[in-house]
Amino acid sequence: MSQKTVKVQLVRSLIGTREDHRATVRGLGLRRMNSVSELQDTPAVRGMINKVSYLVKVIG
């Protein structure tokens, strides 16, 4: 059985954001604007996405 994955895209700049939010975005594997990272769909990853939901977009 394959693992479920979720793709996340950074859609807003990190300029002016809190340091812990920047660290969370880096933890999601995102570096630049419009960069996309494919991650396993786990509760930990979902929590990270929820924390920085104003910066990222979950794509199909």
Swiss-Prot record:
Assigned keywords, A-Z: Ribonucleoprotein, Ribosomal protein
UniProt superkingdom: Bacteria
Gene Ontology CC annotation, any one: cytosolic large ribosomal subunit
GO molecular function, one term: structural constituent of ribosome
This protein's record includes keyword Isomerase: no
Membrane-spanning residues: none
Stated family: Belongs to the universal ribosomal protein uL30 family.
Cross-referenced NCBIfam families: rpmD_bact
Subunit structure: Part of the 50S ribosomal subunit.
Protein name (record): Large ribosomal subunit protein uL30
Species assigned in the record: Ralstonia pickettii (strain 12J)
